């Protein structure tokens, strides 16, 4: 079989994770990488045995690339996605989809018109941990979901990231850097969100680069680094969330309370067991349910997109899901600024869990209609947008 050709735009830190994992999936093949920093792209290409494209335009012009993986900074997401779409490529984007709803809608509309598909990170929702939790919910492990509690606290990435400035700029901070993992998981497990209310603060006007050649450099903080959020779902479920880069203590939690118990979801990565509490915790009735599927890593969303294209179906980590998550996060930002609740206009289509035996390391046989790269159907782009 012929693996789907992939081109990567952006050779920053996150590209290592994609290049490592995509090399282990036989259904896809990284052909080339490009970056505005030509030397950085060349170094990554040499390290992982792929080609370095001289420019992004050169990468987009290649006939052996069907999917473009957009790993640029958030401010460049829309421009790179639109250029890839104009070149007839499908797009897998890092989170967030874009920085605003107008550009996000422009990306999805352009893809719809061009007959290509946009899918978007985070692909942790395709990891065996969250997939296992979704199957348990659908099987009624905790009864009817009623409330949600999520928590993400830590000191922030400025201590370890060699170039953390963009993580404290518009389109980042804890809400847009870490929030997509939580918000996308909320939507995956509990359905569309209809309203949010938030409060935020920015305790420090400046941060300091903690590692690398720029260690000691001060830089401005452009976004709130602590947010407390209330969320209402279309189903009636109500959630409480904290997103913070201002705590020396590192804590992560994602708990769904149902009519018959509590589900602890491993939201921070691709694996880990789901914990289920049946009844009252005084009975010490917690049990761990290990995921049945094969291990998955960063880049599994690119693989699932490639298989979806060959099957002629929408990808699970779809553009409409990313659009809905983006609107939710922008609404959180607006509510924190205005002090009033904000309604969410978009929705998201239901996402079916992957089959328990779905294996990223397996070589699958493409359908006969996909030999040259099939186009997924239009609902992959339009579903969920109002």
Feature names for model-found ranges:
Residues 36, 292-302:
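Active-site loop of classical SDR/Rossmann-like NAD(P)-dependent oxidoreductases
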Residues 124-220, 339:
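Predominantly a Rossmann-like dinucleotide-binding segment in NAD(P)-dependent oxidoreductases
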Residues 49-56:
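Conserved SAM-binding strand-loop segment of SAM-dependent methyltransferases
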Residues 184-271, 300-312, 329-332, 347-386:
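Contiguous beta-strand/loop segments that form the cofactor/metal-binding neighborhood of enzyme cores
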Residues 28-31, 286-290, 307-324:
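Glycine- and charged-residue-rich phosphate/anionic-cofactor binding loop of Rossmann-like
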Residues 66-67, 73-74, 78-125, 140:
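Beta-strand-loop-alpha-helix segment that lines the small-molecule cofactor/substrate pocket
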């Amino acid at each position: 079989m012929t693996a789907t050709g992939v081109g990567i735009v952006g050779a920053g830190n996150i590209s290592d994770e994609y290049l490592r994992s995509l090399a282990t999936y036989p259904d896809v093949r990284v052909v080339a990488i490009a970056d505005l920093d030509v030397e950085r792209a060349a170094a990554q290409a040499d390290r992982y045995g792929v080609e370095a494209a001289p420019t992004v335009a050169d990468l987009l012009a290649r006939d052996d690339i069907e999917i473009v993986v957009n790993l640029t900074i958030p401010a460049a997401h829309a421009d790179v996605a639109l250029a890839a779409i104009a070149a007839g490529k499908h797009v897998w984007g890092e989170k967030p989809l874009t920085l605003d709803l107008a550009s996000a809608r422009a990306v999805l509309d352009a893809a719809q018109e061009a007959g290509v598909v946009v899918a978007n990170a985070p692909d942790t929702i395709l990891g065996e941990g969250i997939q296992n939790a979704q199957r348990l919910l659908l099987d009624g492990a905790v009864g009817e979901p009623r409330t949600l509690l999520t928590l993400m606290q830590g000191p922030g990435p400025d201590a370890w990231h060699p170039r953390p400035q963009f993580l404290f700029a518009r389109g980042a901070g804890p809400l847009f850097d870490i929030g997509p993992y939580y918000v996308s998981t909320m939507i995956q497990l509990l359905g569309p969100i209809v309203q949010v209310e938030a409060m935020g603060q920015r305790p420090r006007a400046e941060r300091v680069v903690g590692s690398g050649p720029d260690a000691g450099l001060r830089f401005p903080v452009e976004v709130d680094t602590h947010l407390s959020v209330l969320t209402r779902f279309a189903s009636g479920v109500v959630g409480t969330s904290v997103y913070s880069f201002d705590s020396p203590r590192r804590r992560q939690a994602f708990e769904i309370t149902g009519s018959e118990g509590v589900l602890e979801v491993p939201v921070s990565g691709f694996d880990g067991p789901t914990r289920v509490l049946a009844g009252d915790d005084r009975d010490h009735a917690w049990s761990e349910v290990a995921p049945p599927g094969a291990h998955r890593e960063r880049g599994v969303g690119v693989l699932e997109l490639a298989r979806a294209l060959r099957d002629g179906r929408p990808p699970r980590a779809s553009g409409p899901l990313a659009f809905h998550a983006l609107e939710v996060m922008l609404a959180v930002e607006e509510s924190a600024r205005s002090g009033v609740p904000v309604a969410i206009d978009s929705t998201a289509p239901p996402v079916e869990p992957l089959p328990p035996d779905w294996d990223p390391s397996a070589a699958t046989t493409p359908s006969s209609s996909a030999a040259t790269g099939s186009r997924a159907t239009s609902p992959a782009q339009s579903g969920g947008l109002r």
